């Protein structure tokens, strides 16, 4: 590979910010706290997206303060082989085939594939997949953290439990309460489908369970025999978890580890996009700028994209109107500054970020209680024009879609993917990948494989000229997101260069990228539809 591209990217990034040499390190003149911004790079691929769903009308310069911790100007002529590039891209990938049945009918989810590529260190994105034991509904979530990973980690671990409890019948909730009261094992709530690389906080699970119990006690008081509807459950779960995150840091906590972790969770933030699939019923809840789309194949074979979410940011006209309705007219000009909420945050909805939700007095009182704020990765000041909080909400927008045979796959991803690729680009890439892999790969579970069959399939693939660099669809999307030029063409040199950027430089060119592709079982969907 030519080193020209990687050398140009490094020098371009370095020249964006005036640097001062200090000892044997390089420092930026700009403020070094990247938490003042949740920046997003902009790709021309997004220009076709509607403004009403929150996509920017044009590009803007990336502004990211960083400290380059290397010694002098290094020789940045790094070279990766295609095999090394693929190894880096595939390090976080995962795939899972769903074998569950519901009343004798195979699950409407056939399989799902995911991957994650970090730009931050440590990565601030999280993901989650679980089956609700009581309802057999499957839940998929993408959680994009900012100001650190603590909030995204907490939401990824806890949100599905709130959702599962919300859907429980009154009788099941009574059984949960009785078991807890008598110190007996709880009924199974979730069946997690974890990736080996998923991290788990174990130190504060008892605190979390206490708050979850308070929630199901309140649900018991409502005396709803069948539990909340799925839409209600999603709305309640998002807002209740965010409220508990806020309350946990206000309550006195004796344990220092728990106290400081709760502080980090509350003062960092996370956007979230969550899908719940049960038979033909697909619900998607979104708060922030993660995104979910459906890939649809019409009867004539043509493919189209069906967006299921809208980005909650400064380019979403409906979101701007909501903010203006919730605050005095005198603040109309200061709600959004430089395309950010109060000039600080890109998304207008998120978990955590209590510094955009609490009053100034409450913030001062909480932070004055002896917390360890030295290492806390939070905003160091209250934004200007902070008059009528809260300015930020975790209330999601919920979309319902009844699955049809033509609905083939669902893509959920953090904004790191959508910064680089438009909705239609993603569908096109998934379909192209299916034509290269899915239609030419024997399904060993469906028919016996022998050498003759394998040879026939290999000859078919060779004759058609089709091949794929990746078996995992999410990996395929990430490869094209960071390796394609402005014309959508893959450039191996660009791809390798983007993967060899130092951590502090990489964040100027791309965000953490987390992608999940859920494939539906068309035959099962047909069966569910016939059964009504």
Curated annotation (Swiss-Prot):
What's any one GO cellular component for it?
Answer: mitochondrion
**Which reaction is catalysed here?**
O-phospho-L-seryl-[pyruvate dehydrogenase E1 alpha subunit] + H2O = L-seryl-[pyruvate dehydrogenase E1 alpha subunit] + phosphate
Query: Which cofactor is essential here?
Result: Mg(2+)
* Positions of the PPM-type phosphatase domain: 107-518
| Cofactor binding, per record | Binds 2 magnesium ions per subunit.
Q: Where is the transit peptide?
A: 1-69
Q: Where does Mn(2+) 1 bind?
A: 144-145
Write down the EC number: 3.1.3.43
Annotated positions binding Mn(2+) 2: 144, 415, 511
Signal peptide as annotated in the record: none
Family membership noted in the UniProt record: Belongs to the PP2C family.
Q: What is this protein called?
A: [Pyruvate dehydrogenase [acetyl-transferring]]-phosphatase 2, mitochondrial
Source organism (scientific name): Mus musculus
């Amino acid at each position: 590979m030519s080193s020209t591209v990687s050398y140009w990217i490094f020098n371009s990034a370095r020249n964006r910010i005036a640097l001062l040499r200090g000892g044997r390190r390089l420092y930026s003149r700009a403020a070094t706290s990247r938490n003042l911004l949740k920046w997003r790079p902009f790709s021309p691929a997004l220009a076709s997206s509607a403004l009403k769903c929150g996509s920017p009308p044009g590009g803007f310069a990336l502004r990211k303060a960083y400290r380059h911790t290397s010694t002098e100007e290094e020789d940045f002529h790094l070279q990766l082989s295609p095999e090394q590039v693929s190894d880096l891209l595939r390090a976080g990938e995962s795939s899972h085939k769903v074998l569950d049945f519901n009343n004798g009918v195979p699950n409407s989810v056939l399989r799902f594939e995911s991957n994650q590529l970090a730009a931050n260190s440590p990565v601030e994105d999280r993901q989650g997949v679980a089956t609700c034991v009581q309802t057999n509904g499957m839940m998929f979530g993408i959680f994009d953290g900012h100001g650190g990973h603590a909030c995204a980690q907490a939401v990824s671990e806890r949100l599905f439990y709130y959702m599962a409890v919300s859907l429980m019948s009154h009788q099941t909730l009574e059984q949960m309460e009785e078991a807890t009261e008598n110190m007996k094992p709880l009924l199974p709530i979730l069946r997690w489908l974890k990736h080996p690389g998923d991290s788990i906080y174990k130190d504060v699970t008892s605190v979390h369970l206490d708050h979850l119990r308070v929630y199901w006690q309140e649900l018991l008081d409502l005396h709803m025999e069948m539990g909340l509807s799925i839409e209600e459950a999603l709305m309640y779960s998002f807002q209740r978890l965010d409220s508990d995150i806020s309350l946990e840091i206000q309550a006195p906590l004796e344990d220092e580890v728990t106290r400081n972790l709760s502080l980090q969770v509350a003062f960092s933030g996370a956007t979230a996009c969550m899908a719940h699939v049960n038979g033909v019923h697909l619900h998607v809840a979104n708060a922030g700028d993660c995104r979910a789309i459906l890939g649809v194949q019409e009867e004539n074979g043509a493919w189209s994209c069906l967006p299921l979410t809208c980005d909650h940011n400064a380019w979403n006209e409906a979101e701007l109107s909501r903010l203006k309705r919730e605050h005095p007219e005198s603040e109309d000009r200061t709600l959004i500054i430089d395309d950010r909420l109060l000039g600080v945050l890109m998304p207008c909805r998120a978990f955590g970020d209590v510094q955009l939700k609490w009053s100034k007095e409450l913030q001062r009182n909480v932070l004055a209680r002896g917390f360890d704020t030295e290492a806390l990765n939070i905003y160091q000041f209250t934004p200007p024009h902070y008059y009528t909080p809260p300015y930020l909400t975790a209330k999601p927008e919920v979309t319902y879609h009844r699955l049809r045979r033509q609905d083939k796959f669902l893509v959920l991803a953090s904004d790191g993917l959508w910064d680089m690729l438009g909705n239609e680009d993603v569908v096109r890439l998934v379909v192209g990948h299916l034509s290269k892999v899915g239609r030419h790969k024997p399904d060993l579970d469906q028919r016996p494989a022998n050498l003759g069959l394998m040879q026939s399939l290999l000859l078919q693939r060779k004759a058609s000229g089709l091949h794929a660099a990746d078996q995992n669809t999410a990996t395929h999307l990430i490869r094209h997101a960071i390796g394609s030029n402005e014309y959508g063409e893959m450039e191996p040199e660009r791809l390798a260069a983007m993967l060899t950027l130092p951590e502090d430089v990489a964040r100027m060119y791309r965000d953490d990228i987390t992608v999940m592709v859920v494939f539906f079982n068309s035959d099962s969907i047909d069966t569910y539809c016939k059964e009504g």
